[in-house]
A protein has these predicted regions:
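Aromatic-anchored segments of alpha-helical transmembrane domains
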Residues: 15-21, 63-69, 178-187
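Membrane-interface junctions at the ends of membrane-embedded or membrane-associated helices
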Residues: 2-7, 41-52, 164-168
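Hydrophobic transmembrane alpha-helices and their immediate junctions
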Residues: 3-5, 143-182
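Helix-loop-helix junctions and helix-breaking kinks within/between transmembrane helices
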Residues: 10-41, 143-147, 189-194
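Membrane-interface segments at transmembrane-helix junctions in multi-pass inner-membrane proteins
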Residues: 1, 21-29, 89, 135-139
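A membrane-periplasm/extracellular boundary helix in multi-pass inner-membrane enzymes
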Residues: 20-23, 40-85, 101-106
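Long extracytoplasmic/lumenal interhelical loops at the membrane interface
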Residues: 80-143
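Alpha-helical transmembrane segments of integral membrane proteins
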Residues: 4-12, 27-31, 53-60, 172-176
Length: 194
């Protein structure tokens, strides 16, 4: 059974990564690679002493998003260009981010509520954008600080549950998936339109 699971893992992981590469999504490719690294760590290593605190991952995610959204382009520019051969507009996502922030400031406590795809495109000023392309901005935009706090509390609860996992390899794998989700959330609306 264990050997069969390993073989299945070795077959599925490259297919998962290659499928994201074929689709051309840099964000999904990186997130999938990180998730795959978590799975491989469980499969390959018999002894595992690595510890990652899920609360640290959550805090690092907030810092990363703040730097990303509020313009640390000088710091991130070289890294993004070297890794993904993309400019720092992240396929023009920074335009959507700026317009989302403007809309958040209009109704910061309760947000605007759910907008239709056409309304989103109109507000964001592009036919190709029907969301803010950042989960945190989308959450603040549609549900305001109230929904943002609810989402943060949910993620704190998840981080606590991950940290309480006794099996170290499983805890590490869950942390890697937590990171994968946050990478997706930085550039897409991963949880869907709230």
């Amino acid at each position: 059974q264990s050997r069969k699971n390993k073989i299945l893992t070795y077959l599925c992981l490259p297919i998962s990564i290659l499928s994201q590469m074929i689709l051309g999504s840099s964000t999904a490719t990186i997130a999938t690679i990180i998730g795959a690294a978590g799975v491989l760590s469980v499969v390959l290593f018999k002894k595992w002493n690595k510890e990652i605190n899920a609360y640290f991952i959550l805090c690092a995610n907030f810092v990363f998003n703040a730097l990303l959204i509020f313009g640390m382009t000088g710091f991130l520019g070289g890294i993004v260009h070297a890794l993904f051969n993309k400019d720092l507009t992240f396929s023009n996502r920074t335009i959507a981010w700026g317009k989302a922030v403007t809309n958040i400031l209009q109704r910061p406590i309760t947000g605007t509520g759910i907008l239709t795809s056409d309304e989103m495109k109109s507000v964001l000023g592009s036919l190709s954008f029907n969301q803010a392309h950042n989960e945190w901005l989308q959450c603040l935009w549609q549900g305001g600080i109230i929904l943002f706090v609810i989402l943060v509390l949910l993620l704190i609860t998840i981080a606590g549950k991950i940290n309480r996992i006794q099996h170290r390899k499983l805890r590490f794998m869950c942390c890697m998936f937590f990171i994968s989700v946050f990478i997706e959330m930085a550039f897409e609306v991963w949880l869907g339109l709230v």
